[in-house]
C-alpha cells in the first residue's frame, strides 16, 4: 500500500507476509466446491493464485502518524506463539524490518488498535524475552 495523507495525518503500512498461502477449501471448508470455483475464476492474481490453487494472504500492520501520536493498527502474527502450528511458522524478520524502515522503535508507539483478536492481528502485542512474555509497546 502506498502511504497517503488525510490532512496532517499520514497512513502507511508494512507487511509481515504476503503471497500464495492456503487452498480455498482449507480457508472455507463448508463452501460448495462448484460455487467456489466459479468465484475463484473471477478473482485477480493478487487474491488467488490459480496455478497453485492457493489464496493470496497478506499480513500487514498499518501505521497512523498524527502530529501528536504514532498508532499501530493490527500487529500481525508475531513470534513464538504456542498452539499456532507450522502454518504460521514463517520468518517474521520482514515485520521487524518494516518497523525500522518506517523509522520507528517500539517505544515510539503511543497506541495499538487491534481490529479484532485473531492470531494474525495481535501477535506482536507481546514478545518472548528471557523466557517471559512482555508487552511490545
PLM region descriptions:
Residues 122-132:
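Metal-dependent catalytic neighborhoods of phosphoester/phosphodiester hydrolases
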Residues 133-137:
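Acidic, His- and aromatic-enriched active-site or binding-groove loops in soluble protein domains
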Residues 1-100, 108-120:
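Metallo-beta-lactamase
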Amino acid at each position: 500500500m502506498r502511504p497517503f495523507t488525510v490532512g496532517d495525518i499520514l497512513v502507511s503500512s508494512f507487511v509481515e507476509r504476503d503471497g500464495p498461502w492456503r487452498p480455498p477449501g482449507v480457508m472455507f471448508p463448508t463452501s460448495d466446491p462448484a460455487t467456489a470455483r466459479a468465484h475463484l475464476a473471477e478473482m485477480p492474481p493478487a487474491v488467488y493464485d490459480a496455478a497453485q490453487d492457493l489464496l493470496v494472504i497478506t499480513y500487514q500492520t498499518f501505521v497512523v502518524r498524527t502530529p501528536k501520536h504514532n498508532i499501530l493498527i493490527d500487529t500481525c502474527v508475531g513470534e513464538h506463539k504456542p498452539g499456532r502450528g507450522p502454518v504460521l511458522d514463517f520468518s517474521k524478520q520482514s515485520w521487524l524490518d518494516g518497523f525500522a524502515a518506517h523509522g520507528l522503535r517500539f517505544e515510539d508507539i503511543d497506541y495499538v488498535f487491534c481490529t479484532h483478536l485473531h492470531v494474525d492481528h495481535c501477535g506482536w502485542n507481546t514478545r518472548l524475552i528471557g523466557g517471559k512474555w512482555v508487552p511490545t509497546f
